[in-house]
């Protein structure tokens, strides 16, 4: 009997032959990047040219002790070492009446030569700790196979108690504060390289320097009056006077239920405070939140 719908149990995704365990969502967006050509003497369009078709794949997963999508898709240590790695992404769909996905599939799509375009990690006080990776590529074809996801996580799904605060290296502004969320993000800013004789780009390079952002949401209690709005500064006309924004190390560690470190996010020692925001506390009953956003460049190592 043909499928009437696709829901979470009837589709799955793999990266380089390994099924993504704990995947929460997957989306595919195809853009043919049409360019219009017109001609003198006629109002109607002359031609619609597909200049360089793109496929974008977004995968979101919970962190559960198993390898990150970042690790499945790339090899090496630092961000620079992993920048040119390409992956094969397969999305498979099965019968909606099955308990789990398994080959042979009802349908499948394979996307080869995919590069990581952006990454985002979110560690909230409410909900699960998550990873979201966006891939971009130029090849999409029918077919492919995805393995059956495991029934259980490797340990437990990580939540707020699994942020190992005592093991983290945090900036001075937030080290003693009550944190409600940590977010790490980077847009790799891929640019295409073309050559005569072929439609698809032969390379998508990372446009260094690459900015990495980490933000800390803090529950404001009003006791830290001197840092409520971040470092203070006064407009001055004194020669040679300026604002000294220090560079600080940031390392975020997540632990499993046994207390062992499952994931480490090392942003190096060159993180600088970029902005501070103060919001909330309105008449709707919400609390005031301070957000401290730090930036660094070209330095991000993820293990786990």
Q: Which residues fall in each region the model found?
A:
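Signature of extracytoplasmic/envelope-associated structural regions
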Residues: 1-304
């Amino acid at each position: 009997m043909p499928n009437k719908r696709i829901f979470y149990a009837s589709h799955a995704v793999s990266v380089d032959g390994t099924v993504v365990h704990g995947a929460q969502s997957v989306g595919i967006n195809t853009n043919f990047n049409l360019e219009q050509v017109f001609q003198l003497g006629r109002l109607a369009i002359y031609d619609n040219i597909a200049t360089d078709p793109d496929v974008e794949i977004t995968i979101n997963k919970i962190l559960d002790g198993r390898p990150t999508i970042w690790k499945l898709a790339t090899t090496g240590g630092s961000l620079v070492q992993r920048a040119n790695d390409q992956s094969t992404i397969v999305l498979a769909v099965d019968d909606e009446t099955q308990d789990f996905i398994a080959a042979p599939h009802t349908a499948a799509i394979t996307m080869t030569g995919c590069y990581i375009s952006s990454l985002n990690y979110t560690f909230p006080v409410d909900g699960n700790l998550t990873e979201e990776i966006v891939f971009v590529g130029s090849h999409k074809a029918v077919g492919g196979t995805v393995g059956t996801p495991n029934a259980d996580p490797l340990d437990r799904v990580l939540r707020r108690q699994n942020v190992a605060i005592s093991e983290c290296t945090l900036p001075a502004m937030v080290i003693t504060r009550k944190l409600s969320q940590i977010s790490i993000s980077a847009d790799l800013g891929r640019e295409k390289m073309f050559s005569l004789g072929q439609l698809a780009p032969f390379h998508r390079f990372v446009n260094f320097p690459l900015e990495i952002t980490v933000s800390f949401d803090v529950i404001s209690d009003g006791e830290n009056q001197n840092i409520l709005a971040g470092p203070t500064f006064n407009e001055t006309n004194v020669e040679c006077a300026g604002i000294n924004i220090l560079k600080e190390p940031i390392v975020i560690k997540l632990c499993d239920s046994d207390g062992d470190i499952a994931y480490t996010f090392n942003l190096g020692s060159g993180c600088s405070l970029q902005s501070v925001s103060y919001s909330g506390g309105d008449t709707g009953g919400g609390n005031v939140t301070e957000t401290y956003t730090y930036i660094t460049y070209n330095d991000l190592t993820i293990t786990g």
